[in-house]
Amino acid sequence: KRVLIIRMGSLLTALAILFSLFPIPVAAVEAGWIDQAQMPEDYTEDASTVTINSAEELAWLAKTVNAGTTFQGKTIELTSNIDLGGSQWVPIGTKSHPFQGTLDGNGAVISGMQVSSDSGGLAGFFGYVQDAEIYDLELSSAVLTAQQTGIQRAGLLAGWVVGSTVSGVTVRDSSMEVTISGAAQFSSFGG
């Protein structure tokens, strides 16, 4: 019996060493909503109105705008409340690819947004908005974190708004944490 116990112990030790040599995949934290983007079922390029009713469809809007489609002359209608909790939000629009359409929130609540920006970026639900309209929307339980070392613009609704109309937008139970380090060329932070 003693020899069997020693051999079993040696075998288990050898197996433990063997398994430690191979990486074991574990559940990863999701990179962000952009990776879960899903085009709305009723979307066509020539439609004047696009309806959004899920976090995945909202992520599709961000991905599509950030790739170069501005939605100028089109209306984006939110048809339900959307929970963005659990993944990082990628802002809609960049300086080179701004959102230029109309967002009609229809009173919808976007909750749980988590967005962060490292140096030199635009952070918010929208990154860059130009010649657009945004109205009738609520952001709730949103958290924005910005680490600022270069040009930085951050706001819970938008990082940068140019020549646009914003009305009927409410921000509730939300927070912004901004850390500035080093020399900043320009900083702008707001709601």
Model-derived regions, located:
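Sec-dependent N-terminal signal peptides
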Residues: 4-18
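C-terminal segment of classical bacterial N-terminal signal peptides
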Residues: 18-27
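Surface-exposed repetitive/solenoidal architectures
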Residues: 27-191
